Amino acid sequence: MTIECANERLEKTRNAAHPFCVVCGKANECGLGLQFSLCDDGSVEAIFDCHEKFQGYRDILHGGITSALLDGAMTNCLFAHGIVAVTAEMNVRFRHPIKLGLPLLLKAKITARKQRKKLTAKSHWLFPKQKPKRRNF
């Protein structure tokens, strides 16, 4: 299957199964509006603009928004492979703060298929070439 066909499947599946999703749903006027696309390696990616309205602590993206975006990326990765599923378990490790005001690349990939109904996917951020500052809270 070509990337173009897979991206069409991704969009069709997302629109049918997830139209009001706060992360990627086109029918959700209050949503974040991320547009995921399939990459050559089977992962999906989207750009997220870390606007200050998504702030948690000063100048840092809220952890709940971070988690929702990571979950949405993994879901869209499944959609790109023709799989509709829900998240049964999710673990997030916050290694360093995500600064506001910078566009970030969000990626997700299926990493394991253990059984017919059990998949593992991982998602992560790619940061601009700028070392995050440590903060004392």
Language-model regions, residue ranges each:
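Non-catalytic linker/capping segments at the edges of enzyme domains
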Residues: 1-47, 51-52
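HotDog/MaoC-like acyl-thioester-processing domains
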Residues: 1-13, 98-100, 110-137
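Short coil/loop residues immediately preceding or within conserved phosphate-binding loops
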Residues: 31, 89, 120
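Active-site helix/loop of acyl-thioester processing domains in fatty-acid/polyketide metabolism
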Residues: 40-43, 60-85
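Hydrophobic core residues within well-ordered beta-strands of beta-rich domains
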Residues: 42, 86, 104, 118-119
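Preference for bulky hydrophobic residues occupying beta-strand positions
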Residues: 46-48, 92, 123-125
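Short histidine-centered catalytic/ligand-binding loop motif
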Residues: 50-64
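Hydrophobic beta-strand-centered segment that forms part of the acyl-chain substrate-binding groove
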Residues: 72-105, 110
